[in-house]
Amino acid sequence: FVMSALGAAVAGALLPTVLRAEQPLRILVLGGTRFLGPHMAEHALARGHTLTFFNRGKTNPGVLPSVERIQGDRNGQLDGLKGRKWDAVIDNSGYVPRHVRLSAELLKTSVPHYLFISTVSVYASFAAANDEDSPVGKLADATVEKVDGETYGPLKALSESAAREVYGPAATTILRPGLIVGPDDNTDRFTYWPARAARGGEFAAP
């Protein structure tokens, strides 16, 4: 059921209409206001689901004002989530395994399913095609929490493990998307290139 909600969010722009969910869900979104989150939320709302955002309230605080907000911090300031129940949680802002473990442990008894948005960057190598069982990158120091180009993938892999360890494989869904592009992409990792190519002439490309 969570996959259908997220699938509508990620692929909904390709659909002529958004189908209403047979069983509307109460969904908690950790993060949810930067790039992917608002698109996901709009389509989940269109399907009839009820959303709650949990975040620090700093990034795009005015986006989707009709959605309930609980302000807090992944770094231990989770009190606003206590005593509440949802049908599923979508972790859209988990980059450090300690943060993922904290939220998963708090929510395990009140939210039956944990969906973690990971990344293809978890894989140790791209020399061959990867699948769910392919080796993931590892950190020399598992206590590192600084997120940069070298640690991003391994930290996401450790975060996946944290979610599974707390919720168990049956109640955990891990998504490993590749490069996501589209409206409001704040990274400009892809959109620059077709725009530059459309201008014509020679240009350097990676």
Where are each of the predicted segments found?
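N-terminal export signals
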Residues: F1-A21
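N-terminal Rossmann NAD(P)H-binding glycine-rich loop of SDR-like oxidoreductase domains
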Residues: L30-R47
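N-terminal Rossmann-fold cofactor-binding loop
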Residues: F54-K58
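Conserved Rossmann-fold cofactor-binding substructure of NAD(P)-dependent oxidoreductases
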Residues: Q71-W86
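NAD(P)-cofactor binding segment of oxidoreductase domains
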Residues: R84-A140, A157-E165
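Active-site Tyr-X1-5-Lys
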Residues: T143-T173, R189
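A conserved pocket-lining segment of Rossmann-fold NAD(P)-dependent short-chain dehydrogenase/reductase
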Residues: V144, A195-P206
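Flexible, glycine-rich beta-alpha linker
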Residues: T173-P194
